[in-house]
């Protein structure tokens, strides 16, 4: 009986630890998660060097967050191929931007992920627009015309295209309108000096009450993939582990019944 209880305890602990790891990541409705995504983006946008004359204040967009969540749940280390025409995933934006961060769950935070994107500034020359390595994440974060953001983080046992990682956090932000066109990410100049008409200046950013409203959409269509598909790897993992748990208990009971004097040494 001691062997049986030990086996059950180990299996329950294993499955519980997996479930706990998956559940510690915030959902797209989590207020702290939303505030962090918006705050950190705007922090970096307000601090650009050289200073920006036309940098728009960025606010949350639930539809963009749903798009990010739907794509993140596929656990693929690649960009969504439907963000630009002829596809149209968002009711207001024709073209969307996207940044992806993937890493282990313990080191994930909204701040660390967005900071990682922004740190690409070290390889970007604003004057010449020459990038030494990868700079697209940075330029999207500080793209002046992108004024809406929606992010999601997904727990992935495996990430396709990132085979070295197991049990990772897959963090995606989508932006509207998308940036990264062959031009400068913003206009250089005195802060807020080139804001749109009727805008005000707040922390070096152009703000507009109407533009900055958080809108919810109820008729957004995501062709070809559901809004909240359950990750197939997560589902398979949980099913297999449940079966293993049941079989382990049955086998242990049968072995003890057949060999009642069996003793296991610690």
UniProtKB/Swiss-Prot annotation:
User: Which residues span the membrane?
Assistant: 233-255
Compartment annotation: Membrane
Which PROSITE patterns does this UniProt record tie to the protein? CRISP_1 (PS01009), CRISP_2 (PS01010)
An example GO CC term for this entry is:
azurophil granule membrane
Give expression by tissue: According to PubMed:8973356, it is ubiquitously expressed with high levels in lung and kidney and low levels in heart and liver. Highly expressed in cell lines derived from nervous system tumors arising from glia, low or absent in non-glial-derived nervous system tumor cell lines. Also found in fetal kidney. According to PubMed:7607567 it is expressed only in brain tumor glioblastoma multiforme/astrocytoma and not in other nervous system tumors or normal fetal or adult tissues.
Identify its membrane topology class: Single-pass membrane protein
Where does the protein principally reside? membrane
| Signal peptide start-end | 1-21
Q: Which CDD domains has this protein been placed in? A: CAP_GLIPR1-like
UniProt entry keywords in alphabetical sequence: Membrane, Signal, Transmembrane, Transmembrane helix
**Alphabetical GO biological process terms:** sexual reproduction
What family classification does the UniProt entry report for this protein? Belongs to the CRISP family.
Protein name from the UniProt record: Glioma pathogenesis-related protein 1
Which organism is this protein's natural source? Answer: Homo sapiens (Human)
**Gene for this chain:** GLIPR1
């Amino acid at each position: 009986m001691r062997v049986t209880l030990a086996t059950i305890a180990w299996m329950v602990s294993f499955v519980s630890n997996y479930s706990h790891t998956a559940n510690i990541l915030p959902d797209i409705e989590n207020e702290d998660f939303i505030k962090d995504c918006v705050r950190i983006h705007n922090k970096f946008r307000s601090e650009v060097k050289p200073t920006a004359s036309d940098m728009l204040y960025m606010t949350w967009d639930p539809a963009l967050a749903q798009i990010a969540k739907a794509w993140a749940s596929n656990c693929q280390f690649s960009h969504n191929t439907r963000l630009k025409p002829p596809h149209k995933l968002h009711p207001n934006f024709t073209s969307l931007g996207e940044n992806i961060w993937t890493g282990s769950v313990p080191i994930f935070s909204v701040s660390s992920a967005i900071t990682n994107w922004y740190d690409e500034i070290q390889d970007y020359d604003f004057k010449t627009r020459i990038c030494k390595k990868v700079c697209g994440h940075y330029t999207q974060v500080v793209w002046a015309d992108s004024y809406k953001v929606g992010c999601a983080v997904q727990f992935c046992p495996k990430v396709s295209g990132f085979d070295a990682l197991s049990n990772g956090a897959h963090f995606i932000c989508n932006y509207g309108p998308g940036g990264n066109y062959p031009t400068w990410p913003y206009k250089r100049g005195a802060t807020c000096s080139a804001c749109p008409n009727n805008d005000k200046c707040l922390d070096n950013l152009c703000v507009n009450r109407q533009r900055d409203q958080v809108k919810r959409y109820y008729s957004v269509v995501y062709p070809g993939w559901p809004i909240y598909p359950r990750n197939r790897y997560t589902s398979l993992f949980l099913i297999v582990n449940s079966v293993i748990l049941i079989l382990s208990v049955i086998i242990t009971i049968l072995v003890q019944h057949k060999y009642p004097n069996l003793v296991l040494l610690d």
